[in-house]
Structures are given as structure tokens and as C-alpha cells.
Amino acid sequence: MHEIFSCRLPKPGRDADALAPSRRDFLIVVVGTGVVLGYARSTLAAIELPLAAAQQTAPGKFFEPTIWYSIDRNGAVTVNIKCAEMGQHVGTALARIVADELEGDWNKVRTIYADSNPKWGSMMTGGSYSVWQNFPVLSRAGAAGRIALIEEGAKLLGVPFEACTARNGAVIAGGRLIAYGDIVARGNLNRTYTPDQLKQMPIKPPSERRLIGRETLALDIPPKTNGEARYGIDAVVDGMIYARPKVPPTRYDCTVRSIDDSAAKSVPGYIQSLALDDPSGTASGWVMVYADSFVAASRAADLVRVEWSVPGAAQVSEQDLQRHAAQLIADKNGGALVVDDPGMEAAFAAAKLTIERTYTTSTVMHFALEPVNALAFEKNGMFEVHTGNQWQTLALPWLAKALGRSEDKIVMVTYLLGGGFGRRLDGDYAVPAALAAKAVGKPVKMVCTRSDDMRFDCPRSPSMQVLRMAFGEGGKVTALEHHAAAGWPTLAMAPSFMPKGVNGVPFDPYAIHGADCWYTVGAQRLRALCNDLANRSFRPGWLRSVGSGWVNWGLESFMDEAAHAAGVDPVAFRLRLLDGAGRNAGGPPSAIGGAHRQAAVLSRVAQKVGWSGDTPKDVGLGVATTFGQERDMPTWVACVARVRVDRASGRVTVEKLTLVVDAGTIVCPDSARAQNEGAALWGLSMALHEGSEFVNGQPKDTNLDTYTPLRM
């Protein structure tokens, strides 16, 4: 269980500029040791990448027990990372898992971020899956290498296998040792393992771990602060030109009627403007403006005039979307029943008290620091796309359809991401870049301005939730009914990922996560509804914590109102429901303890803030508790917000957030803390400040002058 108390906010009324550190002041306090990042693709030697692969591994003999890492004759361990690095330090965490089981010398560990080679399997980074899902695979891969090295090291030392142990990059037998690098250089490492053998590979007990759970400097921090790191927007190749798009008025079904570039011809460096022909339908109605520099492309794009044929979606407003959501919820026969316990109607019919509430959220944009971009070109029969991306496996079929070639003739090279947040799960921006390069037969680097990015964003859909609760004798909760309507990103982009509800209707789990809670509430009904008007009007996207971000907000707000209606303290009310009865007891492999673990974090945070004590005048405490995106994720969290209200102006100021988190095994504590703090502050930002709306089929806010997230 980890406690986080660092989310204290500045008091209102102070000059924001006086509080804001300069970029130089911020960077100058960050220090660390060096690290090498790179891509193992010798065909791209002319491209500016993080660092050349040749700098990473000593020439000559090396040992590669699995596809996930190799060891060279100097003992350097190079770990292949198939997940995207976007500030969460995933490479450090995954390398740490390998190195701990391998007993590698952490000072000799390096990471390579892999391209879209099919050997890596599905490549997706999001949903808090990376460490959770890769831990078993990578830990067993590390253990397999350790056993093979001990076997060969024992032979070289002339001692039995049983007399040897491994520690910190060496095999030790009594007072003698041989380094891993020497074993690689001198030995005959030919041990192989079948997939079934790897699955059965024993790993260390937690008490013997030396790296997992210990503080360490993230491997990507030094290159990010000294300028060596390379993001997608930094990618270059000889002979490339630049392009900026003219984004059509709606996501779908726009067609170009005419292009007038007469004014753009006055811009030095301007080349031409072309309408893209996209068989995939990803970039319908896009016009690409080419120039010899991004500055020229951007200036020219502002002068190019495009006339489109616009579909009916151009008239859709936020109010239309919410009205449609209300109509969907009112129709009791629609949607997918995710949970549908018997006894629901009887519980409400016999209830001593019932309550019903409706909760809505507005459109939320991503606004990643690095606007979307991609460099694309054809070389030696392969079409290469260089960009920061979270889900290469999803984007490759779109690229194949758009380019008219098979997926094995396309490779995506993933760079560091200047913000992911779910935006780069949707690799739609790779398609127009590739089409732009195909159209002119040369490398093209497409860079969107922030406004372009937002017009083409896949925002978090506006949502509506209706919750009902029934109370029986003694205030016992006897039923909970929960309806949630929103645009469904998985339906728009990956419908094969959608399971079926108990009524046989497919649903988007990422638009309902968090509703199937750990509370014991008697009969439970959970209904997920797709706001089809939203899906027709724009492409809904996944955004930081996905469905849980807005679904749990509705559920926990409702729990407060239910506690008030029942006349029970909000913490006590929740603890009463977190009794671990039935399926809420949880179970293996990851959710052992279930509701009791959620009750533990809730009790702990209440204790830390003095929940039952007095607060100053005009200051109150608010509480919420939730769990990981999936019920079987080993994560439970509770948060208390200390809030001050100015009675004269009505201004609400959140003074402090206190979080307690149980996330099971923590590989990198500092990174886990940072992710929790960032999630809490972003949630606060969306609650108090963020939110846009659709006006005439477009998001109203396309830059940070009107879209106002939480400020430093």
C-alpha cells in the first residue's frame, strides 16, 4: 500500500506567473547518469534516431535466450521494449523485471524500443496493461537466462551447478566468480526453452528480489533532459519535405470540391497542395499542403482555401448528443446488459426508500504536448512510418488498406511520445502522412499544429449516467441499477475487442469500466449504451483511465448522495458495502482480497486525513474510492479532497488531495507515484476546469487559449 501526499495546490489569488518555474529552472534541477536508447534497424542508419544500435552492443558473440533481451561479451544486457514510452518510464519498469530475475548488473542494462516486427506479437501501450501483463512473461524470460548462465558458468568454473548462484551480473561459487560477459565470450550457451517450459519456469519469491520495488532513476530521464532523446517530431531523413494538413469540417464523409492555392504561392518554399485519396476512409476530405520546411507549410496552409461537400454531421451540437443519450437511456429495451441479477424489480417494488440521479460529463480533449505527426517514405520495397504511437497493431491494417499493400510491407518505427494519454492509441494520423508520401513519391514529414490536432482529435465522448438505488429494512441496500450512454471508441476502432453482454449484445468495455464495482449492493443491473450519434459525428477516443475516468465519477458521486439519503457517514456507508461477500471476495491471479483491499485503502485514507475530526469554517472533505480499469487488476485507490468554498463568490478551491493506493507489486516506486499524482491532478483538472463542446460538428476549443486545464 502506497500513500501519496504531494498533491497540494497553490492558494487562490496569487499571481500564477510568479508561481510558474521557468523551463530552465525546471530542467536544471534534474540530474542523472547516462543511458542509451535506440532502434535495432540497420537500414535506418541515415535517420536521426535516439542513438545508433551499434553503440549499444559490443561486436562479436552475444547470448539471446529469448526475443526479449540479449547479453554481449561485456555483460551488457539489452532489453527489447515493445511498449511505448510516453512519460510513464515503461522501459525502465520492464527492464527492471528482466534484470531482477536474470540477476543482471543494473548499471549495464540498456533498452531498445522495438519497431512493428510481427515477432513481438500485439503491440499496444495503454490501459495500465504494460507491467501487469508483461510481468509473468519477462520475469520467466529473465529466470531462463539466469539458469542457462549458471549452468555454463558452473562448467567454466569446474564446479557442480548446485554449488553456484548468480548475483549482479556474475555466477558465484564460494570465493570464485565469473562475470556474465566472460561466460558469453568463453562459453557455449545453447540452452533453449519451449514456450511450455517458460510458462512453468519458477521465479524468485518476493523476498529475494533486489531491483523490483527499489528506487531507481528512470533510464529515459537523462536523455530527455540533455537533449539526446528523440520524439516523433524530431525524426528526419535525407530528402524529406514537410506537409501540414487542411483538416475537413467533420471526421467522416467530407469530400473536396475545390482547392485554391493562389495565395499560398507567395510563400517561399511552398510546393503544392493535393487532395488525398484514402481507400481506408481514415482521412476523408484531407488536403495536404507541401513545402520545403514546416514553417513554410504552415504559412501556406493558412492561405490555401478548400471547399468541401459537408455531411449532416456538421450540424451536430453537444446538446444534440446529450439529448440523444437521454433518449437511449429512456428506452429500457436498448443496450447491452453487462450485469443483470435476478430480483431487481422485486427489490425496487419492496423498497422503503429509493433514489435516482443523473450525471453528465462534457467532451474532453487530449491536448498532448507534442501534436500528432509522422514521417513516411518508401525504401527498398518497405513503407516506413516513423512516429510516436501506442497501438501499432491497430494502425497497421489501416495503413495497409490506405496504401494498397500487405502489412508485411509496412513497418512502424516508434519514437518517444510527447504525451500519449490515449490519443496515440488511435494511429489515424499515420495514414495521411503515408498517403502524402505516396502521392509525391518522396519522404514526407507531416506535422499538425495544435489546432489541427484538436480538429482531428478523438476526444472522450460526452456521457450520461442514470443510477437508481433501493433501500430495504434497516437502510440495507437491496438493489443498484446503472445505465451509461456515451460514444464507444472500441466500436469505432477495434470492434473485435468487444465482448457480449448477458443479453447477447456486444458492448465497449472501455466505456463502462468501473461500473461493475466491488460494492455488495444486492441485485445489480448494469447497462451500457452506445451513443450512435456520437459515433457518427466524430471518432470517440480513449483518454487517461478511459471509461473509469467518468463512470467512477458518476458512481462515487451517487454513493455520496445515497449515504446522505440514508443518513450515514459517506466513509461508513462505503465500508458497509465493501464486505467482500460472494464474487466481491476477489480471487487469483491478481485480485485476491477484492473488496477487502478496497476497504483497506478507504479506511487508511480516512485515518490519514482525520476524517471524523473537525475542519475549519468553509472547509470540507470529500471522499471517493475506486479500483483498476479491470476488476481483475490488482489496484485499489481511495482519495480525499480538502476543499474550501468562498461563500461570497461561490469559488471552490481544492487545497489538497490525499491518496492511498494498493497496487500489488510495485516495480518502480517513483514512477508509480508519479503516475498516481498525474492521474489525480488530471482528474481534478477535468472536474474543475476542462471540458469542451461540439458546435456544428467540431470541438469548440482547438487551442489552450480557450481550453483551460489545471495550471502550475
Predicted features and spans:
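N-terminal export signals
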Residues: H2, L19, D25-I47
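Flexible, low-hydrophobicity surface segments
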Residues: H2-F5, L49-Q55, A99-E101, W106-G334, ...
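Glycine-rich loop/linker segments at domain edges
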Residues: H2-R8, W120, Y129-N134, A185-D234, ...
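Conserved beta-alpha junction segments in alpha/beta enzyme cores
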Residues: L49-I97, P222-P223, A229, D234-A235, ...
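Short beta-strand elements
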Residues: T66-D72, P223, A229, N373-E378, ...
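Thiamine diphosphate
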Residues: G91, R96, P397, L416-G441, ...
